[in-house]
A protein has these predicted regions:
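Histidine/acidic-residue-rich, glycine-tolerant segments that coordinate divalent metal ions
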Residues: 80-91, 95-180
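Short, glycine/acidic-enriched loop or turn micro-motifs at the edges of active sites
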Residues: 17, 46-48, 166
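Metal-associated gating/positioning segment near the N- to mid-region
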Residues: 33-100
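Receiver (REC) domain switch-region micro-motif
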Residues: 29, 42, 130
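Divalent metal-coordination and catalytic microenvironments
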Residues: 5, 10, 34, 45, ...
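Histidine-rich, glycine-flanked metal-binding segment
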Residues: 1-39
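Alpha-helical transmembrane segments and their juxtamembrane interfaces
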Residues: 19, 53-57, 141, 173
Length: 180
């Protein structure tokens, strides 16, 4: 099957059946006969480690690698240094990505025992979700108080990506495995 795609200002403007003529004259035609056109991948769980661990990689290097692999959008986790658990840290990440990323991006906001009241203020058109650790976590991102968990689930108003581990079960199973 064949067809054409018209791109204007880096945006797909038209998708046309085989013999359909574009509505406007085209400046450049690329013959892609024999090739496949596929949509870009959205990676909804990345750890770019920026800010804080940029000796490993940063938003620019990781987004460049992502683009080379067909990833057009990423959603970065909040366990960076500093953690993305305040509006200030979140806004700083968005500002940094605006100058570094070569693909589309969004960021998770990390829930803590002390920031559940901030969740309703998050911009749902920019923030992809709330990351919730209910088991062992890095930094202060463990949410282990029932009243806070209720607030997180009631107030988030968006996707909640949760680690629902029970640390006592993990510890018991680890001990049992080591004894075998």
């Amino acid at each position: 099957c064949g067809g054409s795609i018209v791109i204007e200002n880096e945006v797909i403007a038209e998708v046309l059946a085989e013999e359909t003529v574009p509505s406007q004259p085209c400046g450049e035609i690329i013959d892609a006969k024999g090739y496949y056109l596929m949509p870009g991948v959205i990676d909804d769980h990345v750890h770019f480690r920026d800010p804080g661990l940029t000796h490993k990689a940063d938003i620019h290097t990781e987004s460049t690698a992502a683009a080379a692999g067909g990833v057009t959008s990423f959603m970065d986790m909040p366990n960076t240094t500093p953690q993305t658990t305040t509006l200030e840290a979140l806004n700083a990440k968005f500002a940094d990505a605006a100058t570094k990323s070569i693909v589309n991006y969004s960021f998770y906001f990390g829930a803590t025992n002390t920031n559940a009241d901030v969740l309703p203020t998050l911009d749902k058109s920019r923030v992809c979700g709330v990351k919730l650790f209910m088991g062992a976590s890095t930094g202060n991102m463990l949410v282990d108080r029932m009243e806070v968990l209720r607030k997180v689930f009631a107030n988030a108003g968006m996707l909640i990506a949760a680690h629902c581990e029970e640390q006592s079960i993990i510890s018991a199973n680890t001990t049992a495995f080591k004894e075998k």
